[in-house]
Amino acid sequence: MGPRGTFTEAALATQPDLSQCTPVPLISVPEVLSALDDGAVDYGFVPVENAIEGAVNVTQDALAFDFDFLIQREVVVNVQLDLMALPGTATADDLTAIHTVLSFPVAIAQCRAFLHTQLPDAEIEAATSTALAARRIGEEQLTGVAAIASPTAAEIYGLETVAAGIEDHRENQTRFLLLAKNQVPPASGNDKTSIVVFQQQNEPGSLLGILMEFEARRIDLSRLESRPTRRGLGEYCFLLDFEGHISDEVVADCLRALKMKQRDVKFLGSFPAANGNSSGREPISEEAWTSSDDWLKSLRRLVR
C-alpha cells in the first residue's frame, strides 16, 4: 500500500515465499480491496491492527460489511517512526524551522506525545501513507516540512532523520493480513480463525451466549471487538479471532452452534497465526473429540 518505504512493504519483505509475486503498489486500503475484488490482483495485503491505536477500522469494516475475502495469513512487524525532513532543515535540539508535519493519520496518532511537546505549533497534514509523505517532501523539495515515516523512507527519498523513534510507546507493532478469494489455507498446527457475529435484535445476553460457546469448548479468544452494523443506532456486530482452524472438529462444532443460534455469522478465514499459543490452555484435542463422538454414536445405536 503506497509507494516504496511503507511499513506494508517492510512487512511483505518478511515473507520470502511471496517474493515470486509481482507487487502492485496502491494508494489506500480501499484501493487494494477494490483491486482484489475486481480481479486486478490475486492477493491483497493490508494493515488491520496496531498495538497503540487498535483496529484499522477501514480494513475491519470492509471485511465485515463490504467484501467476501478470506484471510490467508497474518504478519506482525515492529514499527519505528522517525521524524525526517530535507537535509539541514532541523536537528533534534532545534525544531523551530518545521512548520508542517505530514504523515498517515494512524502514524500521527501514534506520535501524539512527541508532537504535543516538541512541535505544538506545527500544522499537521494527513497523507495516504507514511512513505507518500516522505516522497512528497523529497520530490517537491518542501522546506520547513517534516514527515513521520519509517527509517527506510528517509534513505529512499533522500531525507535526513531529525528525530528517531518518536512513537509514544516503544513496543509498537502493526498486524497485517494477506487476503484472497475463495480459498482457505490448510491447517498448520498454529492457526487462528476470524469471524463476525451479528447481534440478534432485542435479545438480552447475546454476547454472553456467544462467549459461552467458546468457553464450553475451551477455545481461547485472542480478539473481541464490537462495531456498529450501519443498520441503525444501537445495532452492533462482534469481530472475533480465536485459536484453531475450521478443519478442527471442535472449531467446526463451535461455528455450527453459533450459526444455529445467532444465524448471522460471517467467516473471515482460518489461517496461520503470527505468534504461538499465548493462553497456555490446551483446547479439546481431536482425539478427545473423536472419542466422545464415537461414544455418542454407540449410545444412539441403542435406540430402537
Question: Language-model segments: which ranges?
Answer:
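Domain-level signature for soluble enzymes in the chorismate/prephenate branch of the shikimate pathway
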Residues: 1-304
